[in-house]
Every structure is written in C-alpha cells, then in structure tokens.
Amino acid sequence: MTSASACPCPICNNTVGNLLLDERPKVPSLQNVALLTQAEALAFPQGTITMVRCANCSFVWNASFDPAKISYDETYNNDVTSSAYYLAHLDAMADRVIASVPEDTDIHYVEIGCGEGDFLSLVHQRAAGRMKSATGFDPSFTGEDKLPEGAKVYRNFFSPDNTDQIPAEANVVCSRHTIEHVADVQNFATALAAAMAPGRTMFIETPDANWILEHTAFQDFFYEHCSIYTPDSIRVLLAQQGLECDVESVYDGQYMWIVARLPEAPGHANPVASSEKLGLHYLENKRQMMAEWTTYFEDRRAIAPVALWGGASKGVTFSLLFNSAEDTPIDCVIDLNAAKQGCFMPVSGTMIVSPETAKSRGVGTVIIMNPNYEDEIRQNIREMGWGAEIRVLNG
C-alpha cells in the first residue's frame, strides 16, 4: 500500500497528514470506451489508482497516474446527450457564459479542451447571433464539418506558447471537464492564466471531490480523473497564477462552476487546513456500503438478473468492483447511447444493452448509477410496462 505521506500535494506541496482514500489495481486506463468483443474488453489496458487527499488544501489526486497509459481514439465515447437532465444542464451553463458579456457587446469565445466542439456550438446557437468568433483547442478534434460559422479549432494542447492563437478581442474563456484529466496541475494552471487578459472572464467546470466524499461515491474515482478539486483547492491553484475566482455548486452538487478573472489588486488564497473528517467518513462508509451491496446482489440475483443503468464512468467502475471472472452478480448494463449497445465495458467485460434488451433478459432489478437521472429513468421504465425493482446509487 502506498504511503500518503510520501506523496507531496501537486498544488501546495504538503506532505503532512495526507490521507489515502482509495487504492485499486487493474482499473481500465479509460472509462468511456465500448469494446466490440468481451475478449477485447477483458484485455483492455490497465493502471492503478492511488487517491490521496491533501490535509492542507483538500486537493485529491491519483499518485500512481501515468499519462502514457492514456490514449484517446475512435473507440472513446462519453456522449450523455440522451439525458434530458444533462441537456438542460448544458443549456443552463451556456446561458451563464452568454450572460457574462453585456447584451450590447459581441461575444468572442475561447474553449480550452473543447472536444468535438459541442459546447462551443451550443453557446453559438443560444447566443442568437452575438457570437462573432470562436476558438477551440483540442488535439483529438475531428469535427470541422459541425463547427458554426466563424469558429476555428486548433488540434493541439493549449499552452503559454500559443497564446497568439487567441484573438485579441476574446472576452470569454471556457474549459469544461478538462482540468480533472490533467496530472501536471501547475503547468495547466499556468496555461489557463496565460489565456487571460483584462476584460476576459474564465469559466471552468469540474467534479467536486467534496461531493464524492460526502456521498461515498467510490465509483467516481477512476483512472482518467487524476486530479479532483474542491472549492478550496481550486482557489489556491488559481491564486498561485494571479487569478481570483468564485465557486458555485452545480449539477445537483456533483460539479463546481468556477468563474475566474484577473483581480483589480494583487491577492492570494491561503489554504485552510481541511478537516480529515470528510475523508475518514468516506473510508468508513465505503467499507459498509461495499458489504451492503454484496449482500444486496446475492439476494436480488437469486430472484432475477440485476442490471445497472448507466454505461458511462460510474457504471464502469461499479461493475468492475463487483463483477469478476469468477462471479458476475451484475448481468448487464443499460445505456441509451445506441453506439454502446451490444458492446462491452473495459476490464470487467460487462455487456451494454438497451432497456428493451435488459427487459427481455428478465432483469428484475435496475440500479441507477447517477441520481440526477432517476426521474427520467423511472419514467422510461414505467412507459415500458416493466416491473423491475429500482434502486439508486447515492440517491
């Protein structure tokens, strides 16, 4: 087992009192991949997670992370736009970005880690003609044919060396669900700061480690997310780069929405020593919850097969914690993303199916992976006339 004291915090360099939250070998190096055969899934590349929480600034990171194990290709699929709840969240965040620019001012938008440009395009759509330029950065981008007029995406990581690719008139910088994938937090924060200028506002969205610990959401620790922030730790990191920020909880507490800017006067954020109670709460509750779920699976599968609903990151981790080559209490995983159906989850090899297929397999228990989607999933099950028992993880 790794000693947490041997792991200096990447943000504040603290080594005193750091807490080892979770250590798991043989986890998939990528979550959001759907493999065509079970053999491919079982042989998928693996890594180790060693999740450590800083006792000083509360940052959580994977001390065993190796970026060489991460390689995004055409099998990567993190599309969750089949959820009305998530689409409403995207709309709300896009509207916040638009509202940050006065109504009589054109929007010149920049996005760092823009993926296929989906959020960029959404902001353009909802800005109703106000967006006059859009600049994105993402090395995996392939969607030129889907970009709105006036948009350009550079297929490279953004760094202080290519600030000249940002138009001088840019007034909004956005980076959603990128920072948690970056192990070199100091260099990435330097790049974010380099993108700033007087009159620009930066928006960052990323998971909140406090929510994970408070809800004992052990399924939210996985290899891709090597850097998980709290309100305190993101303030400290950005302050080190001369930025001040406000942090708000969004997505029913699972994410943070960070609004950063250049301060009018120099300032700094001192880490507030974080109580270890939250981490200890997580450790104790995790042991109890794992035991309870093991018993629950034994009881329910004696009646009928059990399925998870949610074939994204949470479902991949949860299935891996309970399914093995020797025992598979989880029969299958349901996902509305048609591109995943008929495929298999990395490492666990659990099959991904449509709701209709799960029903036809005789599934009698459905466990919802994300409580945010409970209402729409329950409605879907009712409309199918399916009498499955429903349980909600972290609900």
Report each predicted region and the residues it spans.
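N-terminal juxtadomain amphipathic helix
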Residues: 2-85, 249
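Conserved SAM-binding loop
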Residues: 95-216, 228-243, 260-262, 316-317, ...
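Class I SAM-dependent methyltransferase Rossmann-like catalytic core
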Residues: 77-88, 280-287
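General small-molecule cofactor/ligand-binding pocket signal
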Residues: 135, 154, 246, 353, ...
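Conserved catalytic loop of SAM-dependent methyltransferase domains
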Residues: 23-31, 220, 248-266
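Acceptor-substrate binding/catalytic loop of class I
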Residues: 38-43, 218-232
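Short acidic/His/Gly/Ser-rich catalytic and metal-binding motifs that mark active-site loops
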Residues: 70-71, 211-214, 268-269
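Hydrophobic, well-ordered beta-alpha structural blocks that scaffold small-molecule cofactor pockets
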Residues: 96-97, 122, 257-395
